Amino acid sequence: MPLLDSFTVDHTRMNAPAVRVAKHMTTPKGDAITVFDLRFCAPNKDILSERGIHTLEHLFAGFMRDHLNGDDVEIIDISPMGCRTGFYMSLIGVPTERQVADAWLASMEDVLKVVEQSEIPELNEYQCGTYEMHSLEQAQDIARNIIAAGVSVNRNDDLKLSDEILGKL
């Protein structure tokens, strides 16, 4: 099985909250695709609550589009990581890490403005696979933590696992 890009970086050295360019690709038609690692908490040290990350999934996707989409950027998808330490965001375009960090912080401010659970988009049995597994309070706690900490940048060159370490794993 091929070694995926996300497993060539040292998770013990990742800062959080932080943005990292996980991958750049160019489609056969010449479109630039960028995948970002939006690391909410430090791997193996903290984890996002199940209900909080699920509610963020519903809110974050729309708010990030509000703040980042434009003439040269269009978000394709934002999905939570299975390890529950962050989200992956795939988009058309090549925004800077700072642009992404600023949009992320603005999105967290938007999460804090949601007043009631009923305002969470697609919160019903027809559009959500576990529509009862949500917590606006937990999502807002996560948002407050991100705003308080600020968002830094993780660089692949700083996190790259050596061939020696990879060979032992």
Swiss-Prot record:
Classification via Pfam families: LuxS (PF02664)
Cofactor binding note of this UniProt entry: Binds 1 Fe cation per subunit.
Residues that hold Fe cation according to the record: 54, 58, 128
Record EC number: 4.4.1.21
Coiled-coil residue windows: none
One function term, GO molecular function aspect: iron ion binding
Enzyme class: lyase
Disulfide topology: none
GO cellular component, one term: cytosol
Gene3D superfamilies: S-ribosylhomocysteinase (LuxS) (3.30.1360.80)
GO biological process, one term: L-methionine salvage from S-adenosylmethionine
Taxonomic superkingdom: Bacteria
Cofactor list: Fe cation
Keywords, in A-Z order: Autoinducer synthesis, Iron, Lyase, Metal-binding, Quorum sensing
Catalytic reaction equation(s): S-(5-deoxy-D-ribos-5-yl)-L-homocysteine = (S)-4,5-dihydroxypentane-2,3-dione + L-homocysteine
Role: Involved in the synthesis of autoinducer 2 (AI-2) which is secreted by bacteria and is used to communicate both the cell density and the metabolic potential of the environment. The regulation of gene expression in response to changes in cell density is called quorum sensing. Catalyzes the transformation of S-ribosylhomocysteine (RHC) to homocysteine (HC) and 4,5-dihydroxy-2,3-pentadione (DPD).
Self-association and partners: Homodimer.
Protein family: Belongs to the LuxS family.
UniProt name for this protein: S-ribosylhomocysteine lyase
Recorded name of the encoding gene: luxS
